[in-house]
Amino acid sequence: DQYKSIGTNEFLYDSLRYYGEPSEKDVQNAQFILHLPPNPNDKVGERVDAQGIIKILAAMVEQENYTWEMKLDETMVANALVSGTTVRINSNAKLYETDAHALAHHELGVHLATSLNGRMQPLQILSLGCPVSTTTQEGMAILSEFLSGNLTLQRLKTLALRVIAVKSLIEDKNFRTTFLILKETYNVSDDLAYTITARVYRGGGYTKDYLYLRGFSAILSAYEHEKDFNNLLAGKTSLEFLPLITRLIDKGLLIAPHFITPAFKNPVQSDAVNTFITHAIR
């Protein structure tokens, strides 16, 4: 429904209705991350272009036996986007190798995997998803980056900057003002400030981006405390429904997830500094 109102004042209203807005706690978490010094242990590797990104994604697809259709798209703001089993990649994307591997674990390891698992379910909603599942889905995607060893402090800062940008949008700041807040207050490059601002202002005001950091915190806690955590991969669902999903799987009414996120199966030892930081987000 929201896409019907793109470019109108209704789009921001629908965005707030679906995704809400950052709480004071969300903003405090973002500020905490943004005031941290660089982590000298973060390794980023060489820069790769869209073809290099495709090579990294294709390797994971082959390894995990995913079904996908890959399309290059020069009109995208994001670096990649999964819709069903179609993976769109920004033809202008240039990422460090670590970020490209993080992208693979994010988009394929969670978004594509839950799409494929959801299509196997008798309940169609688990394939389609809905706005209420966004926090969980994006939280799991960031967790996948973290457990694969590819979540850098700079990536966390980018997620934190999205919170600040959404807050600025809601405070009725215009595009230019939000861009300058990111650039001048947080010393962000022109390219990154523009990309973050464009993501938030697209369509007329898209508040979804603040949910990545909130979702990651909630999902990290669930990963560490919920024994049936992987059942969240059964489709496009939300953390609050995990007990119900588990009961339905146990009764044979839903199918246990076939595709398990690689980083959930084989997590790597994370950098001690970033591990401390991620657990400090509350």
Task: Mark where each language-model region is.
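Hydrophobic/aromatic-lined pockets within catalytic cores
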Residues: 109, 113, 117-118, 145-149, ...
